[in-house]
A protein has these predicted regions:
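Phosphate/pyrophosphate-binding catalytic cores of soluble transferases and nucleic-acid-acting enzymes
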Residues: 1-294
């Protein structure tokens, strides 16, 4: 899966791994968050794991700030930053350089965005891209016609600021990422998820979740995570263990589906099925090599 691939690539490209997962930041929650183990890590540095107490809120804005810092530090060491796993919106804060906590989502921005979305629906992606091409040819060369979301984001910035998008810090950030997605047939994926949940139970998830429950986990940010909140009704004696475990499996499958949908909506994701085609790993390495030479 993602963890194994990120570690393989870190060895190959002198990389360091940044976790893009909103739950792996919490200390003491190792099994339910599928946190990388010290054995798996080996000598590969990992970041943004075990940095919060269970009562702390962790936001996308905080993730972006910390991840940006780590990316800079890793790059200064001449290592390759590899962001593994992840919560869709967290990753988007990096790939789109979202200015969180600013007025980015104010009314004017929303109106401009909705206008271009409507134009794209009525006249097609190419028409919208041509408009960008006229206004900012440098940006249009770097943004694929198929990636309407980024084309609209560029038009939005141009219209709102009166400046070229290619002169904005966002422009640089949107081009500094190579997105690699792992996929496989849905039945295979779901079967793996079910088995993984069974394994978590065997490895002590019940004890971990009970500890969180005893700390008042139902009212804590960390208690919202999949694998924990489904067990709380069981600890209260309201449902059977079987029902709770089935609910974890169901929620995990839904989450995986949402993650895949998020990546599929990002036109610049490159997909590989290394479960069915293990040799695809060589293709991924070649891909990264080519990208690094750009």
């Amino acid at each position: 899966g993602k963890t194994a691939l990120s570690i393989k690539l870190a060895h190959e490209f002198d990389g360091e791994v940044i976790s893009g997962d909103s739950m792996q930041v919490y200390r003491h929650l190792d099994i339910g968050t599928a946190k990388v183990t010290p054995e798996e890590m080996g000598d590969v540095p990992h970041h943004l794991i075990d940095i919060c107490n269970i009562e702390e809120r962790f936001s996308a804005a905080r993730f972006k700030k910390l991840a940006d810092q780590k990316i800079d530090e890793i790059a200064q060491r001449n290592h390759l930053p590899i962001i593994a796993g992840g919560t869709g919106f967290y990753l988007q804060t990096l790939t789109d350089n979202l200015a969180l906590g600013s007025d980015q989502f104010d009314q004017q921005t929303l109106e401009i965005r909705n206008h271009w979305k409507k134009v794209a629906e009525e006249k097609g992606a190419e028409y919208v891209w041509e408009r960008l091409n006229k206004l900012d040819p440098v940006a249009s060369v770097r943004i694929p016609k198929s990636n309407t979301r980024r084309v609209i984001r560029a038009l939005e910035v141009i219209q709102k600021t009166g400046q070229l998008f290619s002169n904005q810090p966002q422009f640089k950030a949107t081009n500094d990422f190579l997105l690699i997605g792992l996929t496989t047939d849905r039945p295979v994926l779901y079967e793996r998820i079910n088995k993984r949940v069974d394994l978590m139970i065997q490895n002590g998830l019940l004890e971990e979740a009970k500890w969180l429950f005893d700390q008042g986990g139902e009212d804590l940010p960390a208690g919202k995570g999949i694998g924990y909140h489904e067990l709380f009704p069981y600890f209260r004696g309201e449902i059977s263990l079987n029902e709770a475990v089935e609910k974890i499996k169901q929620d995990s499958r839904h989450y995986a589906k949402r993650q895949l949908t998020w990546f599929r909506n990002k036109a610049d994701t490159h997909w590989f099925d290394i479960l069915r085609h293990p040799n695809d790993i060589n293709q991924i390495k070649q891909f990264i090599n080519d990208w690094l030479k750009k």
